[in-house]
């Protein structure tokens, strides 16, 4: 560890010696001057050493035929298990091989968490794509800024706010395969110093059978559909040039049908309800700024199966931070956050809290040199105190070439479900800790028309928590992961091409092998993909997406002890077309998925979607 820190310090020395002597595409935006708000000090793409991907309106406006998990699964370094399975199925995000419990989901910069869920992860099925303005993806450890869970990466989902006009009526209506229907209607606008965005979304799908039908079984399995309703309301009050408050309310409810397990049909269903209320407030102080984020989140999951249960989770989150420009080349960030978590439905209504103070110094535009150094102090009610840090340098060797690196530490506290839940709870669990290393290079030529980014990473996770059947949750010795990503992109007038290749390997304990295995469970070593887009005419846009997912190792849990199963690789070919009418106020779209009708299983014993189509119209009237 000391050698690696010394190596990074040596890189900083080289930078000092040198001192002494993201591009638009129709798939991903990586202009060098794009501001990344998830860093909390608004770093530019050209300044930061973090590996960031920005999905802007040019991507999201052409993704209305997809779900959010499907869109995220097309990005480098991210695997979303269940993204192309039945719509009602659970979705799990793997960030560079780290499970969904190690990824932080933000909505408008506010941490989303469900203490009653698997690993405390937020349910991505709750967010409709048509309410999203922008997505910022930060890969690698981010625990210094976002605390527990931010070991694999951060996804910041920025929702739409009021339109410039006093009144704008917008909506989406679509229909597709598996009797899938979606409708959104909304109002947005700005009147004087007040802006608003209010919407209602309804989704219904008959879906497919979640469980695969075993070979030789002549009985047809029933379909496992879903029906969801959601209301989103976001407001902005600008009281002066220096002070604004932005409250929000989100309410989602849905009924999700599911089966008993792999190859096992059942008439199970769960009724999920989620409400989030809170506010953002910003006060400008000369060259400084104070930001406050508060939210109250409550989730309930009424499980109806052979083992009925009511699972409830509650979180109160408060984050206050201060930015100050210390001259033109140095920025200061100081903040505190406090989180209260509770399981109201569990015996004794267990709860816990964690307090943190954090800060960073960001030195930028010092000739070719940029450097961010940060630290975080954490105090947990049960586990006491600990510290994390991050060191992130970058060097712009020439205008077209940037070197970057990162060393950071992270931690994750056991969730309340792990400590007090119904299945396998263990009060003797220890927090998980990680060490993260990253280095890479980025090329940018012809004013962003040609870009190439490559990054290699390594993560060591100690005391990783696993569910070891039948004992329950327990700490394993370690989990080690390493890999690299390559992301080329071309933008030539009306044509764009973006691609990626990701390699991930590691070893971890799993209870299928009942020991440490030299593979990562359900995570492929190799994934690659490409998206080509063409603005064929002023009104017609078309694109094609190809994605390859390598072989994975899973488990057959219908046998005891569970047996190791190898899942073959698969490839997906998708296409999208959009035509604008009435000065782009009306747009017709068609989204086709799995054109080759590939037969595959993301998870052993569960079905995946075959060839499917979603077509519809979206409109803006003002």
What residue ranges belong to the model's regions?
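Conserved C-terminal beta-signal and adjacent last beta-strands/turns
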Residues: 5-10, 14, 20, 188, ...
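N-terminal periplasmic "start-of-domain" segments of outer-membrane beta-barrel proteins
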Residues: 33-61, 92
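Short acidic/polar hinge/loop motifs at secondary-structure boundaries
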Residues: 111-139
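Periplasmic-side early beta-strands and strand-to-turn transitions of outer-membrane beta-barrels
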Residues: 156, 164-166, 172, 189-270
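Outer-membrane beta-barrel signature, preferentially recognizing the C-terminal barrel domain
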Residues: 263-280, 284, 396, 400-402, ...
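Extracytoplasmic beta-strand/coil segments of soluble accessory domains associated
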Residues: 69, 73-111
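N-terminal periplasmic accessory domains that precede
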Residues: 68-71, 91-94, 103-106, 122-125, ...
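Gram-negative outer-membrane beta-barrel transporters
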Residues: 365-367, 458-460, 475-557, 596, ...
């Amino acid at each position: 560890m000391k050698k690696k820190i010394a190596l990074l310090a040596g890189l900083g020395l080289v930078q000092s010696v040198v001192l002494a002597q993201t591009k638009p595409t129709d798939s991903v935006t990586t202009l060098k001057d794009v501001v990344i708000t998830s860093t909390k000090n608004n770093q530019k793409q050209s300044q930061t050493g973090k590996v960031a991907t920005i999905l802007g309106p040019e991507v999201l406006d052409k993704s209305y035929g997809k779900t959010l998990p499907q869109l995220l699964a097309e990005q480098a370094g991210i695997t979303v298990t269940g993204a192309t399975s039945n719509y009602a199925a659970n979705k799990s995000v793997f960030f560079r091989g780290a499970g969904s419990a190690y990824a932080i989901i933000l909505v408008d910069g506010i941490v989303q968490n469900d203490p009653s869920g698997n690993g405390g992860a937020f349910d991505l099925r709750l967010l409709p794509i048509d309410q999203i303005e922008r997505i910022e993806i930060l890969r690698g450890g981010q625990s210094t800024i976002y605390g527990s869970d931010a070991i694999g990466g951060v996804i910041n989902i920025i929702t739409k706010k009021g339109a410039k006009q006093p009144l704008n009526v917008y909506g989406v209506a679509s229909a597709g395969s598996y009797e899938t229907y979606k409708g959104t209607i909304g109002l947005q606008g700005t009147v004087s110093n007040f802006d608003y965005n209010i919407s209602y979304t309804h989704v219904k799908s008959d879906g497919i059978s979640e469980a695969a039908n075993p070979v030789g079984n002549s009985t047809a399995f029933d379909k496992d559909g879903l029906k969801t309703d959601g209301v989103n309301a976001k407001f902005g009050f600008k009281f002066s040039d220096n002070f604004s408050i932005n409250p929000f309310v989100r309410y989602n409810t849905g009924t999700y049908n599911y089966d008993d397990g792999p190859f096992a049909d059942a008439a199970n269903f769960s009724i999920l309800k989620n409400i989030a209320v809170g506010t953002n407030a910003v006060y400008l102080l000369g060259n400084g700024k104070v930001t406050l984020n508060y939210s109250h989140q409550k989730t309930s999951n009424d499980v109806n199966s052979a083992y009925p249960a009511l699972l409830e989770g509650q979180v109160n989150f408060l984050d206050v931070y201060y930015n100050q420009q210390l001259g033109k080349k140095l920025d200061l960030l100081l903040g505190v956050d406090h989180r209260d978590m509770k399981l109201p439905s569990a015996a004794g209504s267990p709860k816990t809290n964690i307090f943190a103070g954090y800060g960073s110094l960001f030195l930028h535009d010092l000739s070719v040199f940029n450097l961010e150094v940060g630290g975080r102090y954490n105090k947990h009610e049960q586990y006491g105190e600990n510290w994390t840090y991050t060191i992130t340098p970058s060097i712009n060797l020439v205008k077209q070439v940037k070197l970057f690196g990162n060393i950071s530490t992270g931690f994750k506290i056991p969730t309340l479900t792990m400590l007090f839940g119904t299945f396998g709870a263990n009060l003797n669990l220890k927090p998980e800790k990680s060490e993260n290393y990253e280095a890479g290079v980025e090329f940018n030529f012809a004013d962003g028309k040609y870009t190439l980014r490559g990054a290699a990473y390594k993560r060591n996770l100690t005391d990783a928590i696993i569910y070891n059947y039948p004992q329950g949750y327990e700490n394993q010795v370690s989990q080690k992961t390493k890999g690299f990503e390559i992301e080329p992109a071309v933008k030539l007038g009306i044509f764009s091409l973006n691609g990626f290749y990701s390699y991930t390997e590691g070893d971890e304990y799993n209870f299928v092998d009942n020991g440490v295995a030299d593979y990562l469970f359900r995570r492929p070593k190799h994934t690659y993909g490409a998206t080509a887009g063409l603005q064929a005419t002023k009104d017609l846009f078309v694109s094609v997406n190809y994605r390859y997912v390598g072989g994975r190792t899973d488990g057959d849990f219908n046998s005891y002890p569970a047996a190791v199963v190898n899942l073959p690789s698969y490839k997906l070919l998708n296409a999208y077309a959009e035509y604008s009418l009435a000065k782009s106020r009306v747009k017709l779209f068609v989204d086709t998925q799995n054109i080759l009708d590939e037969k595959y299983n993301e998870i052993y014993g569960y079905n995946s979607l075959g060839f499917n189509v979603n077509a519809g119209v979206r409109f803006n009237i003002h």
